[in-house]
Amino acid sequence: MKILFLAILICSSLIFPSSSFASHIELKPCVEIAHCVREEWEVNNIEKPFEKIKTFIENTPRTEIVEIDGDYLHAEATSKWMKYVDDLEVSFLPESNILSIRSESRVGEGDLGVNQKRVDLLKSKMF
């Protein structure tokens, strides 16, 4: 009986990788503050906050969602003139109603405040 239980446990771990059970992906901290912004917001009074921010990102010009995994979203925002690509990540923790946002430029030392403006715009659409 123990062998059967162990076999079932091993098989289920092969069929369902541990990442499929993750409900929250922790966003990396900002290493270079000059071109990265990371914030966490309590979204207690907002119905379906992840869906709301996802819809806004889908409708943002020059921004393309490249990955969605449960309550995690990764998008790429391309600048209008120089075509620089910034990474925008959103992760939602439903148990505590915390929405984590991270926006970072891929190149350069600074971003002329673009990432902070992007995060501020998202926040204004949420609240």
State where each predicted segment sits.
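Positively charged n-region of N-terminal signal peptides that target proteins for export
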Residues: 1-5
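Bacterial N-terminal signal peptides
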Residues: 6-15
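Ser/Thr-rich, low-complexity intrinsically disordered terminal regions
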Residues: 17-127
